[in-house]
Structure formats: C-alpha cells, structure tokens
C-alpha cells in the first residue's frame, strides 16, 4: 500500500469532515473553518500532486474559493451548492486513490 494513498485518503476525509460542519448562518465560525480547510488544502497540494491530476487539484482549489465567497456573502444557495461540489470532488479524489480492479485496469 502506498504511503501517498494513505495520506490522500486521510486528508480528503479530514477536509470532508470540516466541510460538512460548515455553517453559513455563523459567518465568523464559517470563515474560521474555511481558513482551516484552506490551510490544510494548501499544505497538502505537494503530496497530492504526486498522484492526483492538476485538473483535479485546480478544481478543488476553485471550488473552495467559491465556497469561501458564498460564506462571506451569506449566500445560502451558493454555499450549499459549492459545499456539495467540494464534498463530491473530495470523494472523487479519494475513490481514484483506492486500490481496485477498475483503477488498475
């Protein structure tokens, strides 16, 4: 089992947990949590880039920026949209890193 596999799945799980706990109705808490997510994400990019495509990395970063803007603007509809997209993208990265017959072929 690859160390990068373990690292990526651990970080995506932590990012997903933080993203799920975001609450747009509490702007200061939302901004603090997004800052925590962003710091973890930026710290993780070098190891992610060893096996995750730059397209996926860029998409995660862009979605996080959009989520941050929705939080700042208290736009609940956009906030929920980008939160769902970020969680789905994190799940996709995690799935791509799993060992399976589909990924091997």
Predicted regions: what they are:
Residues 30-73:
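Extracytoplasmic/periplasmic/luminal assembly and interaction segments
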Residues 27-28, 76:
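TPR-repeat structural position
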Residues 55-105:
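Structured, soluble extracytoplasmic/luminal domains of envelope-associated proteins
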Residues 4-22:
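Alpha-helical transmembrane signal-anchor/signal-peptide segments
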Residues 21-25, 70:
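Hydrophobic side-chain positions on well-ordered alpha-helices
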């Amino acid at each position: 089992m690859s160390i990068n596999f373990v690292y990526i799945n651990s970080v995506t799980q932590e990012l997903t947990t933080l993203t799920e706990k975001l609450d747009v109705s509490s702007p200061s808490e939302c901004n603090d949590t997004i800052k925590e997510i962003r710091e973890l994400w930026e710290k993780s990019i070098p190891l992610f880039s060893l096996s995750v495509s730059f397209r996926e990395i860029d998409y995660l970063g862009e979605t996080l920026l959009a989520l941050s803007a929705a939080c700042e603007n208290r736009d609940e509809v956009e906030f929920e949209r980008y939160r769902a997209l970020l969680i789905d993208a994190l799940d996709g990265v995690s799935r791509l890193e799993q060992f399976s017959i589909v990924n091997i072929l």
